[in-house]
Design a protein with these regions (language model features):
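N-terminal secretory/membrane targeting signals
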Residues: 1-31
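Transmembrane-helix bundle segments that line or gate the permeation/cavity pathway
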Residues: 18, 26-41, 45-295, 330
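Secondary-structure capping and boundary motifs in well-ordered enzyme cores
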Residues: 128, 132, 186-191, 314-317, ...
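Select transmembrane alpha-helical segments in multipass membrane proteins
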Residues: 132-138, 221, 319-321, 352-359
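Hydrophobic alpha-helical scaffolding
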Residues: 147, 235-238, 311, 315, ...
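Selective recognition of specific alpha-helical transmembrane segments in multi-pass small-molecule
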Residues: 220-227, 312-329, 361-366
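Hydrophobic, small-residue-rich membrane helices and short re-entrant helix-turn-helix hairpins
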Residues: 241, 295-311
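Long, well-ordered mid-to-C-terminal structural blocks that present hydrophobic/aromatic surfaces
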Residues: 333-366
Length: 366
């Protein structure tokens, strides 16, 4: 008769063997943006039904296995800051160097967009925005941790501006720090995400370097204006589409930043990461930037456990996640024969309008 321990050992061995076999015998995978197009050897309808059932079954399993969990924050974790090497990496000097490099890359991207070769294949801006930033940062956030919150150059430039103004004007703050309206919730982020995906998927001139540079400047003005009115981290964690999306992806990651024994600070925080008010603050950078070093942890945790928490999900955040999922699916729809047939029956001058309406309708129906 098998014991629970022997069954666990057997199960672990099977999973390990399966993983090794998958790696050893899988064919070479080619990146989506650089490889040849691959058509599925199954009918599109069958693929769509299978994908839909996968989503439904996933939600059912999450509801079944996490519904009875009472200690959502009590998963195993290791504080990496207990190691001297990790404390050195988390020192202000390495962080300042990394953030400065990010600022330099941002400035170089904008200058290349305005003054460089306008051929997208010979300009830095399209590669930096669509490949290195949007795809690369997303993968790092999901597989490692919230890198964007660490290196965000727009936040860094605002911090520098705050420091300069404070020195020149006897400690005067750049932000007015007005209370963030509850009615706004995450709707600015939803609107920003829709505009971004429209530029990526529908706008035919979205790869033109000068247009990318103009878009970065417009985004900078909007972001810095929000920081001035409502505060730096309050705006980023409530209204900035990219900070929120990368933060959601970071919930899959094995690394987290945690504020412990700081409930007095958590009670006054307006960050979505702290709205539960009952557990330690995880990846709530509004709290972490104000906390003392002894209350901060840089933890290694099992992957994807950041998804399991008792944080109240607002309706606007639910819509944002749906828009994120819908637009990724819509990107695949643009490569199907159905969409090609629609474009064949559309006037050239109307293609952008047809695509825009289809994007909104698809996200609404999703």
């Amino acid at each position: 008769m098998f014991t629970n321990r022997s069954l666990d050992t057997f199960s672990t061995g099977c999973r390990f063997t399966l993983a090794i076999g998958t790696i050893a015998f899988s064919p070479i995978a080619v990146g989506h943006g650089f490889g040849q197009r691959y058509d599925l050897p199954v009918p599109l309808l069958l693929w769509v039904i299978g994908a839909g059932l996968t989503v439904v079954v996933s939600f059912v399993m999450v509801g079944v296995f996490s519904g009875g969990c009472k200690t959502l924050g009590s998963y195993p974790r290791v504080n990496l800051l207990k190691a001297s090497l990790m404390r050195g990496l988390a020192h202000w000097l390495p962080l300042a160097v990394i953030r400065t490099i990010a600022v330099i890359l941002l400035i170089a991207t904008v200058l290349a967009g305005f003054f460089g070769n306008q051929d997208p294949f010979y300009n830095l801006a399209p590669v930096m925005v669509w490949v290195v930033w949007w795809v690369g940062i997303a993968f790092v956030c999901a597989l490692v941790g919230d890198l964007w919150a660490l290196i965000n150059p727009f936040r860094t430039l605002f911090v520098w501006a705050e420091w300069i103004i404070g020195r020149l004007m006897n400690g005067r703050q750049l932000s007015t720090v007005r209370p963030y309206p509850l009615a706004l919730s995450m709707w600015p982020a939803v609107a920003g995400l829709l505009i971004f995906f429209w530029a990526e998927l529908i706008w035919s001139a979205g790869s033109v370097p000068k247009n990318i540079a103009v878009a970065i400047v417009i985004y900078s003005v909007v972001t810095w204006s929000g920081m001035v009115v409502y505060g730096r981290d309050v705006w980023l964690q409530n209204a900035d589409a990219f900070s929120i999306v990368f933060g959601i992806l970071a919930r899959f990651a094995p690394l987290e930043l945690r504020l412990v024994n700081g409930k007095a600070l958590i009670r006054t925080c307006t960050s979505p990461a702290c709205r539960s008010k009952s557990l330690d603050c995880v990846n709530g950078y509004h709290c972490l930037t104000k906390a003392e070093s002894e209350h901060r942890e840089w933890n290694l945790r099992p992957p994807a456990l950041g998804l399991v928490n008792d944080q109240q999900v607002t309706f606007s955040m639910m819509v944002l996640v749906i828009v994120l999922l819908a637009t990724v699916t819509f990107d695949g729809l643009l490569e199907t024969r159905l969409w090609t047939h629609i474009l064949d029956r559309t006037l050239t001058s109307e293609i952008r309008w047809v695509g825009s309406v289809a994007l909104v309708l698809f996200a609404s129906a999703f």
